Amino acid sequence: MTPSDFISIDYKTLTKAQLKSYIDDLAEYLGEQSYLYHTIDKPVITDSDYDKLFRLLQDLVDDNPQLKPSNSVLDRVGGEILAGFETIKHKKKMTSLANVFSLEELRDFYDKIEYDIELECEPKMDGLAISIFYKNGKFDYAVTRGDGIQGEKVSENVKTIRNVPLKLNTSNPPEELEVRGEIILDKQSFLSLNEYMQTHENKTFANPRNAAAGSIRMLDSKVVAKRPLKLYSYGIGYFSKDFVHPETQFELMNLLQSFGFTISDNMFLAKNFSEVEVYHHKMSHQRADLAYDIDGLVFKVNNIKLQDTIGYTARGPKWAIAYKFPAEEVESEVLNVEFQVGRTGAITPVARLKPVAVGGVIVSNATLHNINEIKRKDIRVGDRVIVRRAGDVIPEVVKSLPQYRKPDAQMVEMPTNCPVCDSAIENINDQAIYRCTGGWHCQAQTTERLKHFVSRKAMDIDKLGAKLIEQLVAADLIKYPADIYKLNFEQLTGLERMGAKSSQNVLDSITKSKEPSLARFIFAIGIKDVGEVSSEALANHFGSLESFREAKFEQLIEINDIGEIIAKNIVSFWQDSLNIQIVDELLGNSINIQNPEKIEQAHNESFTNKTIVITGTFENYNRTELTQLLKSMGAKVTSSVSKKTDMVICGDNAGSKLTKAQDLGVEVIFEEDLQNLL
């Protein structure tokens, strides 16, 4: 299930029994996502989606309290405890804050308190929550939030953080004190760590929060000590009777600072809601300029006695609230605009941005698409801009904010020559796309073409990654695809960070790739606009590389999935003597292409020339077998439902595709119907 599967269901039309099932499923799903986020630090949905679903579950249970699921995320904070860690019970429950997502909701929170109050305001840092226990002023142990009742003991790692006091800076420390805070990695340190990780371990962290959480859970504290983690304190938990508690939250934070803890420079005391709005506006605008990642703002009733009067819910305090920023769009600043050269020579302008968190990921680059878009949006170097990142989509600059434009902001101009090889840049028929004419003579195009050639869906040389391709091209060891098959052990071990084992793995991977299917080979040689689907269609139609090389334009356009533009590109490809030479050299290096077996197409009126989508799980088929079976009967199998879909075949747990098919009036059949038709 995905967030959209839950959101797409109209729960108002459900019976009580169906609604109970829906609520239970939603609670179970949120429990799984909470575990992935809080316990193993591998979230698969965005914070924004989680917050929407949590709010939906809350609303449903508020309206139907008799349907409240037991032991759900509504009763818990965070995730379960990893089995491999010693667990320690918090002296005082480590709760979390309720969320609001608009100024209107924030105003509701303020008005409900029914007092003329001051609010202590601070950034909501996005890191790992921690509780540090001090005994007689000395560091005793540190515990993660865990499930709010007990957490993982990570004392040795937390001790390595430079700004964590090992002894409180006071001559009269309390006997016992729990200090709460957030362990973070600032944006610049995160980028530096990821660069190191990519170079030395060939992996990276998704965002600063994951980097901080992953570091604190490492077994080797010596490694943790090398990472520039920081602790920002935001409050206290348990305290012994001899602790003299300040009268206000603001004074408490100043006291913690005097003890030696780091607190945010952006704390503010709002005397009324108008000042809350001013703080909200200021921090929303300055978010991109902060050294660290924040995902919202926190507002706490300043008066401690009033906090006690207002009280708590099972999840957390009623006297504090977290305002969450919209996850999709944030402000940043364009530091520079550079032009990248792609596999086909397309020149793409890329904005170099002041690093900013968008959708849980630190973004320092964003596409500007093309020069026409830059002019239309009036984007200049030095501008404040809105940056968007949705799902796994490449970040883009949505618009500029000219009201903040500096006098020295620079217009962006398209270069006349390639920034890599200095070849001329051409613009055909005044289209938005500009291309470098250097082809294989352009190192940028060469590098990207070779990365494509070895990729998983092409020749699938899995041990020959992008970074190694860049190394090999820079060392002038490879220029054309055939050069990959000429690499030897000595050349590879001579490269930086390439040992004997790694080098042999690369050579084994290269050898393994020498018998590709015809479809993979066609895709790998990189004919413009020929993707996976087109490659498979061409391979199945022509049956051999020899037949494909001789194909005429008229033959090509008769094939499903091959339009006139692709047909022209194929003809042009085989008219280029360098392309022919590259392919011939590959064949001369023991590449043995596996031609597809000719499948006699069975005629079945139910499936021939039909566009079909398969969804769910089946008792008598796996998805791959069923796809091939339908294709053999002349069907076109696609992955998404649209108005062009003729039929959706549903197994168990069909999900949103079934719902969409029903909404569009597309024919739906189930496994029993399928067996009858076959």
Swiss-Prot record:
The active site is at K124 (n6-amp-lysine intermediate). Zn(2+) binds at C418, C421, C436, C442. NAD(+) binds at D47, S48, D49, Y50, D51, S96, L97, E122, R145, E182, K300, K324. Belongs to the NAD-dependent DNA ligase family. LigA subfamily. This is DNA ligase. Its cofactor is Mg(2+); Mn(2+). DNA ligase that catalyzes the formation of phosphodiester linkages between 5'-phosphoryl and 3'-hydroxyl groups in double-stranded DNA using NAD as a coenzyme and as the energy source for the reaction. It is essential for DNA replication and repair of damaged DNA. It catalyses: NAD(+) + (deoxyribonucleotide)n-3'-hydroxyl + 5'-phospho-(deoxyribonucleotide)m = (deoxyribonucleotide)n+m + AMP + beta-nicotinamide D-nucleotide. Its EC number is 6.5.1.2. The keyword Manganese applies. PANTHER family: CHROMOSOME TRANSMISSION FIDELITY FACTOR 18, DNA LIGASE. It comes from Francisella philomiragia subsp. philomiragia (strain ATCC 25017 / CCUG 19701 / FSC 153 / O#319-036). One of its GO terms (molecular function) is DNA binding.
